[in-house]
Amino acid sequence: MKVGLIGHRSAGKTTVFNMLTGLQAQVGGYGGKEEVHLGVIKVPDARVDKLSQVFKPKKTTYAEIRFTDFPASQNDDDLKGNSNLVTQMREVDAMALVLRDFEPDADPLRQLNDLLTEMILADLAVVENRRARLKKEKARPQEEALLERCATTLENEESLRNLEFSADDENLLSGFGFLSRKPVLVLFNQPDDKAGQPLSAAYQDELKRRGL
């Protein structure tokens, strides 16, 4: 499984990456460069351990999670024109959004909105480009109708994960790797004195509203 970590600068994204992977990637060290941190962890599994004890294979292989720590985001335009970064993001299976919530003036819900908007805009650009090509071909009415539905949703600033698709639709969409369709885990990076406390009602309501 591949998981991508995204977040604004100083959200603690790379710190989370280091904690998950045991690596020591430089924190706050991007300096405007489009570098990406990669890390892999083995997933402990008691069932695999038991089978290994019984069958005694030469090698015991555990499932892996591959984490990608993407460069920090600054605003809604960060993904525009950055086709290389967007391509890398489309290759992950799920997104972890790291939100800064350890300062009095932090606004994690605004950060959440910014990050989701970036993904929506990136998907909309892909949809618009594909629709333009289909209009010239005039040979795939089913795909045209499907992408029109996607475009309407994205133009309303809604994620594609909120839509339901048929099996045929899924086949047509499988090659796009839409960012706003990927499962999302939201991480609120809070101070130690909030550890173990439930999220505020405002946070929970916003996540529920967005289907997260």
Model-predicted segments: where are they?
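Conserved G1/Walker A P-loop phosphate-binding module
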Residues: 1-104, 108-109, 116, 127
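C-terminal-of-GTPase-core extension/linker across diverse P-loop GTPases
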Residues: 2-7, 11-17, 21, 133-212
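Residue-level detector of alpha-helical recognition elements and their boundaries
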Residues: 31-32, 66, 130, 141-142, ...
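Class I S-adenosyl-L-methionine
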Residues: 52, 128, 204-208
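G-domain G4 guanine-recognition motif of GTPases
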Residues: 70, 96-104, 110, 118, ...
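A short, gly/pro- and small-residue-rich
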Residues: 108-119, 204-206
